[in-house]
Amino acid sequence: MSNTDYAALNKRFAIPGHLDFAPGPGGLAVAEVNNVHASAMIALQGAHVMTWAPRKQPPVIWLSKAAKFAPGKSIRGGVPICWPWFGPHATEAKFPGHGFARTVMWEVVKTETLRDGATRLTFRIVQDDATRAQWPHASEAHNIVTIGRSLDIELVTRNTGNAAVTLGDA
């Protein structure tokens, strides 16, 4: 399933009255959350929290006015995911600063409404030949975002191989 197949995304993961998937700024696919506690917009590219605002309050997380939206380009502002390294790559100057997680599509794997009315989305990074050329380690990364009275973001990396892996993230 393509992450830009909004009908399929909404059929599988939407939560009526709380969560929908739609084209966002620059045509990027986004999850739009509105629940009893807050509202948020999360780009599927980078699993990037672009906005978060407590209910009936001004935004606490927002995008830069200089933000540009294009597939494969990092979004300025919000809460970007830096993975699997932070800053410049240790040995390859041509690799992107702060890793590639900000510029690739993440897959939605789970959505749920919590007992207190918060909305939780779980994303998994989608790797391809280009990302494996930069990060050839057996691993998985998930970004778990909970929109409630507070904004909770949990980045989880799992080593799925037998060799030790060193990474940096933010």
Task: Tell what function each PLM region has.
Residues M1-T146, S150-D152, T160-A170:
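Surface-exposed acidic/polar loop and edge beta-strand patches at domain peripheries
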Residues L155:
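Acidic (Asp/Glu) carboxylate-rich active-site/surface patches
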